[in-house]
Design a protein with these regions (language model features):
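C-terminal amphipathic alpha-helical segment
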Residues: 231-296
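N-terminal extension/subdomain marker
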Residues: 1-146, 150, 154, 176-180, ...
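A short, acidic, amphipathic alpha-helical segment used as a generic capping/interface helix at domain edges
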Residues: 165, 169-173, 271-280, 329-344
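A general structural signal for short secondary-structure junctions and capping/turn motifs
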Residues: 42, 53-57, 98-106, 181-184, ...
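Catalytic or ion-translocation cores adjacent to nucleophile or general acid/base/metal-coordination motifs
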Residues: 194-257
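Active-site beta-strand/loop microenvironment that shapes enzyme catalytic pockets
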Residues: 168-212
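Glycine-rich phosphate-binding "P-loop"
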Residues: 142-165, 300, 304
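Long, compositionally biased intrinsically disordered regions
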Residues: 1-9, 23-31, 284-392
């Protein structure tokens, strides 16, 4: 699998070097390798969906490999499609990826798509019968990344059950129960958790060629792994902010902007502050502010976004436009956040874990979540390039 990926894919870091003299040569090598592997039967062909079991440390995460219809996907912020982006899509990142995908006979996806399945209708019933299913692959992953196993779902009755579950998730009754009175914004089924720019690339290529290819062409669809947002092993890590080069007090700027709708609670140290923010109740938006040696829990009484990170980011964007600070950096851990917050003229923003119950509501209300809202696990928990699908 490792060798196949190196020959059949271009590492994301290499995208920034496209335009150099070896660009066409490298892309041609990828296409040639794909065709050779296909013609020489390097791949084992399977039809139908696959149940994926990924063991990572103490947890086991499940997913459903399937193909989604790109006609039902729109990555723009104003999207009202059934399938939407979670974060804003950077248009400039799409053309380099199009150069690679266009003309490629295969796709090797790493795309993770989330479903807001609180009743566990779609994937969990498949997990319950996995011991009766044929195993497609079963092996350890490299560099401490755990173990992966795939089960074939190429059975007519199982496929009917999957489609019935999707129909129920799309039903007016289910949607109204989760999101309130129906409108064009809250008719949503899937949200892209990881790999949105890759999926946006597939969408653009399909839109460019669909009149020539026709509605039944395989490139109308893109293979992804569907995962339940409410899987206990699906962990969303918050991404904190460090505000650099402030021209004034961030705490005072918050008070000026929000007035009586924001409150400040001081703590003796950063550990107590972090614990208090982590313990924030569902439906309440609070974050930690570290500035000038103070440790303050900030709470919005009238939040301006569905998620706390959205309310914070909107405020920071306003201040950036006003020239109130030099830049914002995004940090995953607390050690660097703490160290940088101690520098004069900086302020650290410690964000709470993303509340799963408000995740889809954030997409519905705001169109897309703010950049750097969350991280889906550590590096060794990311999806590997394992499955391929013919698209030309």
């Amino acid at each position: 699998i490792y060798t196949l990926s190196l020959h059949d894919a271009l590492p994301i870091s290499s995208l920034y070097y496209l335009g150099k003299v070896d660009e066409a040569k490298k892309i041609q090598q990828i296409r040639s390798a794909m065709r050779a592997y296909d013609e020489e039967n390097v791949f084992t062909t399977h039809r139908g969906m696959i149940l994926v079991e990924r063991q990572i440390g103490h947890a086991t995460r499940y997913g459903l490999m399937a193909a989604i219809d790109l006609e039902a996907y729109d990555y723009t912020r104003a999207s009202t499609s059934w399938i939407r982006a979670t974060e804003g899509t950077v248009a400039e990142r799409i053309p380099p990826r199009m150069k690679i995908r266009e003309g490629a006979p295969l796709e090797l996806p790493h795309i993770l798509v989330l479903v807001d399945d609180t009743e566990k209708l779609l994937i969990e019933p498949l997990v319950a019968i996995r011991d009766t299913l044929p195993v497609v692959y079963d092996f350890d992953l490299m560099m401490g990344s755990g173990h992966i196993r795939g089960y074939s779902l190429a059975d007519g009755e199982i496929e009917r059950r999957v489609l019935a579950a999707i129909d129920r998730l799309q039903s007016d009754e289910t949607l109204a129960k989760k999101y309130g009175p129906l409108n064009e914004r809250n008719r949503i089924l899937f949200a892209i958790g990881d790999g949105n720019h890759s999926l946006a690339t597939a969408k653009e290529i399909w839109e460019k060629n669909k009149k020539t290819w026709g509605p039944d062409h395989p490139a109308r669809y893109a293979m992804v792994e569907l995962e339940n947002l409410h899987d206990a092993a699906q962990e969303f890590e918050p991404i904190h902010r460090i505000v650099l080069g402030l021209s004034g007090s961030l705490k005072n700027a918050l008070a000026d902007e929000f007035g009586g709708t924001v409150s400040f609670e001081p703590f003796a140290n950063r550990e107590a502050l972090f614990a208090a923010v982590d313990a924030t109740k569902d439906g309440v938006q609070s974050f930690g502010l570290i500035e000038d040696g103070e440790f303050v829990k900030v709470t919005f009484a009238e939040p301006r976004s569905a998620l706390c990170v959205g309310s914070v980011q909107q405020f920071l964007d306003q201040l950036r436009k006003a020239g109130f600070f030099k830049e914002v950096d995004y940090l995953h851990g607390t050690e660097e956040l703490s160290a940088l917050s101690d520098v004069k003229g900086n302020a650290g923003i410690y964000l709470p874990p993303v509340q799963k119950n408000g995740f889809f509501e954030g997409i519905i209300k705001d169109g897309a979540l703010p950049r750097k809202t969350f991280s889906m696990g550590e590096a060794q928990e990311k999806r590997f390039y394992i499955e391929a699908r013919r698209i030309l």
